[in-house]
Amino acid sequence: MAKQVFQTTFAGRELIVETGQVAKQANGSVVVRYGESTVLTAAVMSKKMATGDFFPLQVNYEEKMYAAGKFPGGFMKREGRPSTDATLTARLIDRPIRPMFAEGFRNEVQVINTVLSYDENASAPMAAMFGSSLALSISDIPFDGPIAGVQVGYVDGQIIINPSQEQAEQSLLELTVAGTKHAINMVESGAKELSEEIMLEALLKGHEAVKELIAFQEEIVAAVGKEKAEVELLHVDAELQAEIIAAYNSDLQKAVQVEEKLAREAATQAVKDQVTAVYEEKYANHEEFDRIMRDVAEILEQMEHAEVRRLITEDKVRPDGRKVDEIRPLDAVVDFLPRVHGSGLFTRGQTQALSVLTLAPMGETQIIDGLDPEYKKRFMHHYNFPQYSVGETGRYGAPGRREIGHGALGERALAQVLPSLEEFPYAIRLVAEVLESNGSSSQASICAGTLALMTGGVPIKAPVAGIAMGLISDGNNYTVLTDIQGLEDHFGDMDFKVAGTRDGITALQMDIKIQGITAEILTEALAQAKKARFEILDVIEATIPEVRPELAPTAPKIDTIKIDVDKIKIVIGKGGETIDKIIAETGVKIDIDEEGNVSIYSSDQDAINRAKEIIAGLVREAKVDEVYRAKVVRIEKFGAFVNLFDKTDALVHISEMAWTRTNRVEDLVEIGDEVDVKVIKIDEKGRIDASMKALLPRPPKPEHDEKGEKSERPHRPRHHKDHKPKKEFTETPKDSE
């Protein structure tokens, strides 16, 4: 296929798509150029159906450092494991694509996005999402797209599509919305306490922009799209399905309605084990035994799925007996752990999260070196999901994509209420340990994080709570669920997480299994979520009404001073000599930023005070008319040099030592003497002149006698006009210093 180029303008930037030139052996490939960002997307599909009971879709987003003209860090100087941002972007692309494959599709599909050129003002992640959909759409892979996504900002009351870097820094909203031309199917957002009305407006305007991108894709697909391949879908034997439903559906219905999670799981598993045993015996010698038993497992899963959904949509009964808008029992505990800087335990039904706070000097911030300019990350929220939380064994090791994603969601939700660096100059780390899980553990971690921050004395603007909303839809009717549990998440159509304060939303995340949801459903879900959020905040605020006024005794104490930028080198010293000496002498930690903010950390307040005193002395400047207790450090014929403080000396000229005339400096002061001096002049080169006599009382003028004549005074001897006295010279150097 020959190279073809398609071009349009979107959100004020040129959008160019090239096909037929590179990666031609993939099922589908495109090069997307948005502004000066360039992304190559290649989509491939396996020839045969994969084994397993899930759709093996893999989406990668690969950041090549050359795209930004940078060398990779580390010893190897080569790209390694994906960064956190790359992992989150891959998830962002995966989520709207996954629902667009047919039920029962089991062929492995890989979508690889490679960033070849990076323009920070033209979103490479959105170009990659566009490219992923387009590569699948023009390929022969059975994909029911296209989809597209955009970033949405909110600046000065205006909604902006795909904001520039400068606009993004000013924005109160960081929203990504994706969907089909008919509906939204993915949302990811952080926001600075925006109302439900503004969030809904941003979502709908974002979807309007999505439609523009989809229309452009449809134009390209019409020109270069391949005919879709016919692939085998996973189907179960209809007769076998009818037989099992007739015999065991009533047993499974009873098991599904057991309210307690572990008991319900045991009851449903008992029914499944019974059915499996019957058919293993019945078809033990059948040549298609493996296929039949796979069908049996799939039929039982479908029966449970259908019954859970029927109970909710028809009977309005949830598996645990709650109403559709009812939250599970709540419990909040603070100070769960000693020694740590703050801790909170939050429980919602059978979902429980422990959050632990650690405060550290700003030197512990995380350095992020990706395609964007390097920056320091002050706040980290890490989420751990051990298998024991669901009563199972499983893999332990580095966090997976799900844990990274849930940690990032909590981070966005809580970051919006953190104090500024000037208000609270600490690096902040929260770790959420999920101890039990029956759905919505990410939102429990947000609630526990709020407890830990407030307990630890971090002056957050307001408490944050999170809730997960669900959806059961049969196409004609739908039911929105508040606080979904694991079974409702697994068999439902939507997982819509909403976090915020009483004043507004701080984070959103929505994933759906159907091809999209309407504005009506979004509106209802946001309204129910607000009501639930307030109920949870009631519990949090009853447990800890306000942020504690002091940090934990084990937390590092901190003091800050501001110095002139040109004084930074004085505090650091040659090769760090001065600052290292201060640290060694006092035992503190010291951080200095480029703006001259000096942060001093220690568990010992006296050590902080001593270090602060030393630094203040190093950067102290003499001022005219100020008085100092100074020490004589050098004597010259023309005066004495005195040390005002630290490395700052001044000259006291011999004429400024006393009101009476003297010819010898040594007659008045000696090296080591301490004298009071007043600064009388600082020249343009910073040289300081001081005076001792300015602090002494001025002697009275000579008195007159009664006749008005001056009192007698010693007469200077007269010299003969031919006799010239020997002239005395006083050395006055050109530069007194």
From Swiss-Prot:
Q: In what residue span(s) does the KH domain sit? A: 556-615
Classification via Pfam families = KH_1, PNPase, RNase_PH, RNase_PH_C, S1
Q: Which InterPro entries match?
A: ExoRNase_PH_dom1 (IPR001247), ExoRNase_PH_dom2 (IPR015847), ExoRNase_PH_dom2_sf (IPR036345), KH_dom (IPR004087), KH_dom_type_1 (IPR004088), KH_dom_type_1_sf (IPR036612), NA-bd_OB-fold (IPR012340), PNPase (IPR012162)
Primary localisation category = cytoplasm
Pinpoint the S1 motif domain residues.
625-693
Disordered: annotated span: 691-737
Name one cellular component (GO) term.
Answer: cytosol
The protein's location, in the record's own words, is: Cytoplasm
Q: Which domain of life is it from?
A: Bacteria
User: SMART domains recorded for this chain?
Assistant: KH, S1
Composition bias (Basic residues) maps to: 715-724
| Annotated Basic and acidic residues bias | 700-714, 725-737
User: What cofactor does this chain's UniProt record say it requires?
Assistant: Mg(2+)
Database matches in PROSITE patterns: KH_TYPE_1 (PS50084), S1 (PS50126)
E.C. no: 2.7.7.8
What keywords are assigned to this protein? Cytoplasm, Magnesium, Metal-binding, Nucleotidyltransferase, RNA-binding, Transferase
A GO molecular function term, named singly, is: magnesium ion binding
Q: What does this protein do?
A: Involved in mRNA degradation. Catalyzes the phosphorolysis of single-stranded polyribonucleotides processively in the 3'- to 5'-direction.
NCBIfam families per the UniProt record, alphabetical: polynuc_phos (TIGR03591), PRK11824.1 (NF008805)
Query: Would you tell me the protein name for this molecule?
Result: Polyribonucleotide nucleotidyltransferase
User: What lineage does UniProt assign to this protein's organism?
Assistant: Bacteria, Bacillati, Bacillota, Bacilli, Lactobacillales
